[in-house]
Amino acid sequence: MINSLLTRLFGSRNERQLRQLNSIVAKINALEAELQKLSDTALQAKTTEFKQSIQDGKSLDKLLPEAFAVCREASRRVLGMRHYDVQLIGGMVLHLGKIAEMRTGEGKTLVATLPVYLNALAGKGVHVVTVNDYLARRDAAHMGRLYNWLGLSVGVVYPGMPHSDKHAAYGADITYGTNNEFGFDYLRDNMALSKADRYQRGLHYAIVDEVDSILIDEARTPLIISGPADESPDLYIRVNRIIPHLTRQENEEAEGDYWVDEKGKQVHLSEVGMERAEDLLRQAGILEEGDDSLYAAQNLSVVHHLNAALRAHALYQRDVDYIVRDGEVVIVDEFTGRTLAGRRWSDGLHQAIEAKEGVPVQRENQTLASITFQNLFRIYKKLSGMTGTADTEAYEFQSIYGLEVMVIPTNRPTVRKDYPDQVFLNRSSKFNAVLEDIKDCAKRGQPVLVGTTSIEISEMLSEHLRKARVKHEVLNAKQHEREATIVANAGLPGAVTIATNMAGRGTDIVLGGSLDTVLAELDPDATEEDRFRVKTAWNRRHEAVKAAGGLHIIGTERHESRRIDNQLRGRAGRQGDPGSSRFYLSLEDSLMRIFASEWVQKVMRLMGMKEGDVIEDRRVTRQIERAQRKVEAHNFDIRKNLLDYDDVNNEQRKVVYAQRDELLDAESIKENIDSIRHEVIDALVTRFVPEHSIDEQWDLPGLQATLQSEWGLHLPLIEMLKGREEVDAERIAFLVQDAVDKHCAEREASIGAETMRALEKHVMLTVLDQGWKEHLATMDYLRQGIHLRGYAQKQPKQEYKREAFELFSEMLEHVKREVIASLARVRIRSEEEMAALEEQERRQVDTLLRQSQFQHQEAGGYGTGDEAVSLQRQPAGQRAAIAQVIRDTPKVGRNDPCPCGSGKKYKHCHGLVT
């Protein structure tokens, strides 16, 4: 109550901040008349003046009013567009490192020019992040005219561009690209073998367009660079053949072999189903006759393949979750409806779907490098974003990214009418109503945009409209090359456009059609009279569409997130234009069936409804929104859970990547190598000659043999120590260190100091990369089973952190040993031979990167996805056994003395076995 009273008195936080920014808007406006008097040359010279001021210590905040005023005046002269006051506010919000929520049609692309120009003056690079390559190239070309006029360089990065071009793009003051490309290049840079091979010059400032799509919707999709593994794909094909012989249950209690939990997106084998699957697998020769259980240790790979095949058949539908094109399974983005060429699901799911569809099955991939978007964008020193719908996710932006959301007022009041949802008993009644609404709009000359959740529905609607002879366009993943043309014409009188989800996002639908597109189609020799005639015709169309009610939005299904529904609605009513929206729902829709059907069915029964009847009630809409809020909260928990686990990986990633950067930047790492060598030798000697031990416990022959096999060093220790009294472990360590140092000095003298320095760097980088790659695979295995610790009354997250730390420490120790051993074994005779080795390694990395793929990993696991499913499918006896794991002796630490009494550390004795 007190809060609401204070808000009424002083305004909300958003309103108070807007008032503060309005005072700066007044300063910018006061400079406008003066700047308009300047010549082009004088205005362009302001950029050089600003750069000098920054070098002299002036802050960007102090420069902001004048820099924004200069950018606005330049935009007016070059682009013919002058920033409104609300756009100036949006620009300031972005500069302050916040998220600007701006409605569709408010000119977000133009708003971004203000903070981009200001921050690019610092010379550290600004990244403008878009959702697809088309928008990146379009905006770079269009806004590049303004930046170039002001003396700033612009680059754009996209997949497959030449190495030198990408270097130049990142060297520009402003770089446009997609979130995927910036992320991939960050990972590639951390696989580079020299400074010259790196693209990026640090992550300084990023403006993320459609920030909700990238930082929320895609936050469960880690970027993964992966290479093909060695396993044969044949097992996927053989396992796929048995799935049609298994029967799906209606629910958990019904008869059958497996049931599908749509809410949790899981598939469960019943007890009967497990026995049936075992029989079928034996008949197919996949399980041997003697195998007593599918879940025996030797059959874990078969379980992995069976789980993947069940999910492929039961949860993933063709033309909804993926399409088959040119003999390949291509993922369809659930949020945008676009195809994600090059992306692959992980954990064998993509291969299982390929086997299901009868296309060539590609090998599974091994992770080489990975990062989540959450951790990628948190690396930037300053981050901001803009979107039409962020306020519903304000808490997540603040808690995960530290980004505050500010709602920017519209330039003109919004007059769009949002009609209540219409709810039907079944899908056929719903789609009949949708078709009638479309036909009514087309008849009255009102353009209509129909939003669907899948390609399948968009094509079904298209077929019905074709039969009814209603002219229309379909915009989905299959037509994505024509996207810009379809969107440009979607505002024409009576135009009917069916769009999958939010395809076409980023391009405004202009009432009457796009004037720019029509003008661009004119002959280059067209006269002013021709242009005037085209503009007059467009004005007539524009007014006719406004009179018909503007753009009408039809939603054929509610999405899991209110934000995506709002994005669809937001396509209408841009810049004060008229418009309307309505959602048509049925009890058979996914969201209604899973989350809201029971309550609504109860209401429908009480009202005596039958097929074809409709409910149109605000209370139903509120109930649906309540269900959506539950789903949003659930999805947030999943993303937060992912981040908690990935933060562990991220700390390790930062250590490894910082080490790589030091290696690449250093002229010489001789001191590091010497230090590591002494450390490794100490550990080696301690392994065979433990400290404070008696000579009966020493293993001098073993130490001699190891020095010979791993180092190529013949050191007759036994002979050297014969007849000596008072010999202890410390003396032996000194003798070995001295011999190894002399051996290394001789090697360096034989090949030259410069070649040795290059060899040290090369070996250190190669071994570190290999160790990190193997560590990532180990961490994947740890993650997949960590939730089982809960059955032993332990906290999975704490266990994950503890074991991850131990694994990482062991990996670093292994890298040290391997570096020293490799340097001792490698035979290099000349500088030319060293250069050839480096070039060969570089070619291998290039080949690996060309073969690498972006896996669309479903990261909802860590005990909430496949891992939990595999446990639930196990026989009850096995589950109970897991729950009763109790340690009856104290755990032995890796560095504690081994309980066997050898005197060695546990990790060097029986710890090696475990």
Curated annotation (Swiss-Prot):
One of its GO terms (biological process) is protein targeting. Monomer and homodimer. Part of the essential Sec protein translocation apparatus which comprises SecA, SecYEG and auxiliary proteins SecDF-YajC and YidC. Zn(2+) binds at C898, C900, C909, H910. Belongs to the SecA family. Pfam families: P-loop_SecA (PF21090), SEC-C (PF02810), SecA_DEAD (PF07517), SecA_PP_bind (PF01043), SecA_SW (PF07516). It is a peripheral membrane protein. Part of the Sec protein translocase complex. Interacts with the SecYEG preprotein conducting channel. Has a central role in coupling the hydrolysis of ATP to the transfer of proteins into and across the cell membrane, serving both as a receptor for the preprotein-SecB complex and as an ATP-driven molecular motor driving the stepwise translocation of polypeptide chains across the membrane. One of its GO terms (cellular component) is cytosol. The keyword Zinc applies. This is Protein translocase subunit SecA. Its EC number is 7.4.2.8. Keywords: ATP-binding, Cell inner membrane, Cell membrane, Cytoplasm, Membrane, Metal-binding, Nucleotide-binding, Protein transport, Translocase, Translocation, Transport, Zinc. It comes from the Bacteria. It catalyses: ATP + H2O + cellular proteinSide 1 = ADP + phosphate + cellular proteinSide 2. InterPro entries: Helicase_ATP-bd, Helicase_C-like, P-loop_NTPase, SEC_C_motif, SecA, SecA_CS, SecA_DEAD, SecA_motor_DEAD. It is found in: Cell inner membrane; Cytoplasm. Its cofactor is Zn(2+). PANTHER family: CHLOROPLAST PROTEIN-TRANSPORTING ATPASE (PTHR30612:SF0), SECA INNER MEMBRANE COMPONENT OF SEC PROTEIN SECRETION SYSTEM (PTHR30612). The keyword Cytoplasm applies. It comes from Xylella fastidiosa (strain Temecula1 / ATCC 700964). GO terms for molecular function: ATP binding; metal ion binding; protein-exporting ATPase activity.
